[in-house]
Amino acid sequence: MALDLAGHGFDVAVHYRGSAEEAQATAQDCADLGARTQTFQTDLSDEAAARALLPTVVQAFGRVDAVVNNASDFEYDNPASFSYALMERQWRANTAPAIVLAQALHEQVTARGATGCVVNLLDQKLWNQNPDYLSHTLSKAALEAATTMLAMGLAPAVRVCGVAPGVTLLSGAMADGEFERAHRMTPLRRSSTPEDIARAVRFLIESPAITGTTLLVDGGQHLAGQPRDVMFLARQNAQEM
């Protein structure tokens, strides 16, 4: 997403929590594409730090026009193993910071008489539910609801939209072969790629008449009615072959 935006004329602030080398490499790639770029380290689960992030970026860049909320924690649980502790970690990583950053963008663009856009990265699983990754899914469901409510409450200065990817990158304990099988378990026989997601994010940022809605970019995975997380289904299919 950062590279796509940088390649289409956007300057890019790259946030990271602990992956400094990866963030610096991404920033360098953005700079090579002609973008002004800088990295910013913040633990978004800390409310004070999350609230300080956007003003810090504004101080460095002069203004912010869009926020892409892609930071996410991804820990496994299910209805039998649910705990307050994990749910709180998921909420503090996946939901609350996105709301705080939308607030901050609204304050910043309103102060200068401008407009802005927030894009929240969600999950096709919200439209294709199963009991795996319960707390993660609940945190993303809350963010999807917040996307609509923020769009209503922050208009007309800020538009708020969502993008719901499918199987896009290796995650958790998924092996390469499982990822390839999972990626094909959609009506289109392909799920989303990073490039697909980046184009969708940029489309929303550049579309001034769109707010309060989510684009599902998943090869139709949300139509498949899968009873388990696709990682487990791909593993099961491999065992049956």
Residue locations for each model-derived region?
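Canonical Rossmann dinucleotide-binding motif of NAD(H)/NADP(H)-dependent dehydrogenases/reductases
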Residues: M1-A13
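Conserved Rossmann-fold SDR core element
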Residues: L5, R63-V64, E144, L154-T168, ...
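The beta1-alpha1 cofactor-binding region of Rossmann-like NAD(H)/NADP(H)-dependent oxidoreductases
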Residues: A20, Q41-L53, S81-Y84, E195-D196
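Conserved mid-core segment of classical short-chain dehydrogenase/reductases
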Residues: R51, D73-R89, E107, A111-R112, ...
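Amphipathic alpha-helical dimer-interface segment in Rossmann-like NAD(P)H-dependent oxidoreductases
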Residues: P55, R89, A93-G113, A151-P156, ...
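Catalytic Tyr-X3-Lys loop
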Residues: D73, A80-I99, V119, H136-L143, ...
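Catalytic loop of short-chain dehydrogenase/reductase
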Residues: D73, T110-A155, V167-T168
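C-terminal substrate-recognition "lid" of short-chain dehydrogenase/reductases
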Residues: P194-V217, H222-L223
